[in-house]
């Protein structure tokens, strides 16, 4: 199984990018949720604007689908500057980064997604650029090689990552501002779904938005993806209006339950409960029981279940929690 193939995956796909551009908030005033982050960024941005300086370099980290790219674009809009966007894997050579840096205007934003995947060679070029706004370039090869320094205009580097722990200490320490994005609560997601529906010209009730928000796993990207699928359902099966019952019927058809679990989430939990008496069960046995690769279980299926308290990893293996039994209306073995 590929994570992006799941409807409730937080990993972005091409369709997400196209629609997200149409509904993405442009300014902090339009940004819903992440209140502590927004409050701090409003102050930092206003202070930089008043001084006529570039904003300090900013690192944004957190799970996928929470709005890191959106926030980077908002920062550029609020500062009234241009933004150039790239990603860690794309910057293969030092020259790739140098080409971007030398084309920046004063106070512009350079946004690097998946910054934890920068190669060491590229990262070395980034250090003096971030600290001193200077670019060290090697001219020639072998004994005749020499280094020249180019002055760069002041700029803001915004790095985004889902794995802040994978960043090297020298790189992490060069960011003046570090912000972590948290999963969204149902109220904020309801507001996000309602706003997205308005942007797409859809008629949606509060109950309809709430129904989607509850099943979105705390992630706006999933909420917006579910909205698009419910839009299709409402268009074909109803009059196009999305209310609570229509949203619930669409989610049932798509096999996404009230907790945002899909078929594979439920299959894993029920395997632990029914086949292994709630656990503990080793990863090899669990993989064989549900017919999935071990890497898929560890990287795709388990994280959300563990985070929400439905599954535990212990030294002896995986165990279903009381919350997992309650979700399926089952009694734990010690209660029978």
From Swiss-Prot:
Q: What keyword terms does UniProt attach to this protein?
A: ATP-binding, Cytoplasm, DNA damage, DNA recombination, DNA repair, DNA-binding, Hydrolase, Nucleotide-binding
Q: Which SUPFAM superfamilies match?
A: P-loop containing nucleoside triphosphate hydrolases, Winged helix' DNA-binding domain
User: How are the domains described in the entry?
Assistant: Has 3 domains, the large (RuvB-L) and small ATPase (RuvB-S) domains and the C-terminal head (RuvB-H) domain. The head domain binds DNA, while the ATPase domains jointly bind ATP, ADP or are empty depending on the state of the subunit in the translocation cycle. During a single DNA translocation step the structure of each domain remains the same, but their relative positions change.
Known InterPro entries for this protein?
AAA+_ATPase, AAA_lid_4, DNA_helicase_Holl-junc_RuvB, P-loop_NTPase, RuvB-like_N, RuvB_C, WH-like_DNA-bd_sf, WH_DNA-bd_sf
Q: Which domain of life is it from?
A: Bacteria
| Protein name (database record) | Holliday junction branch migration complex subunit RuvB
- The gene designation is ruvB
Query: What function is annotated for this protein?
Result: The RuvA-RuvB-RuvC complex processes Holliday junction (HJ) DNA during genetic recombination and DNA repair, while the RuvA-RuvB complex plays an important role in the rescue of blocked DNA replication forks via replication fork reversal (RFR). RuvA specifically binds to HJ cruciform DNA, conferring on it an open structure. The RuvB hexamer acts as an ATP-dependent pump, pulling dsDNA into and through the RuvAB complex. RuvB forms 2 homohexamers on either side of HJ DNA bound by 1 or 2 RuvA tetramers; 4 subunits per hexamer contact DNA at a time.
Would you identify the family this protein belongs to, as annotated?
Belongs to the RuvB family.
Kindly state one GO CC term assigned in the UniProt record.
cytoplasm
**So what EC number does this one have?**
3.6.4.-
**Location in the cell:** Cytoplasm
Positions contributing to DNA binding: 313, 318
Question: Where in this protein does the record put region Small ATPAse domain (RuvB-S)?
Answer: 185-255
For region Large ATPase domain (RuvB-L), the annotated ranges are 4-184
The beginning of the lineage is: Bacteria, Pseudomonadati, Pseudomonadota, Gammaproteobacteria, Aeromonadales
Q: Name one GO molecular function term.
A: four-way junction DNA binding
């Amino acid at each position: 199984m590929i994570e992006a193939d799941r409807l409730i995956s937080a990993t972005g796909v091409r369709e997400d990018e196209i629609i997200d551009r149409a509904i993405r908030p442009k300014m902090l005033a339009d940004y819903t949720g992440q209140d502590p982050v927004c409050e701090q960024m409003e102050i930092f941005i206003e202070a930089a604007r008043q001084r006529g300086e570039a904003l300090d370099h900013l690192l944004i980290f957190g799970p996928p689908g929470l709005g890191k790219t959106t926030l980077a674009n908002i920062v550029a809009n609020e500062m009234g500057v241009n933004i150039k966007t790239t990603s860690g894997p794309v910057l293969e050579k030092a020259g790739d980064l140098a080409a971007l840096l030398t084309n920046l205007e004063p106070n512009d934003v350079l946004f690097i997604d998946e910054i934890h995947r920068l190669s060491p060679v590229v990262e070395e070029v980034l250090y003096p650029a971030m600290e001193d706004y200077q670019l060290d370039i090697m001219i020639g090869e072998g004994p005749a090689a020499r280094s020249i320094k180019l002055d760069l205009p002041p700029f803001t580097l915004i790095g985004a990552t889902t794995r802040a722990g994978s960043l090297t200490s020298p790189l992490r320490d060069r960011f003046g501002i570090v912000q972590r994005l948290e999963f969204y609560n149902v109220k904020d997601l309801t507001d996000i779904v309602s706003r997205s529906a308005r942007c797409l010209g859809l008629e949606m009730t509060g109950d309809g938005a709430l129904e989607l928000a509850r099943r979105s796993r705390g992630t706006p990207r999933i909420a917006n993806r579910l909205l698009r699928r419910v839009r299709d359902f409402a268009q074909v099966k109803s009059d196009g209006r999305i209310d609570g019952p229509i949203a619930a019927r669409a989610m049932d058809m798509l096999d996404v339950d009230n907790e945002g679990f899909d078929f594979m989430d439920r299959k894993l939990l029920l395997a632990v409960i029914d086949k292994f008496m709630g656990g503990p069960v080793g990863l090899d046995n669990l993989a064989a029981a549900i017919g999935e690769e071990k890497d898929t279980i560890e990287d795709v299926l388990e994280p959300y279940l563990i985070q929400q308290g439905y599954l535990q990893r212990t030294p002896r293996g995986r165990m279903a929690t009381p919350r997992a039994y309650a979700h399926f209306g089952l009694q734990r073995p010690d209660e029978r």
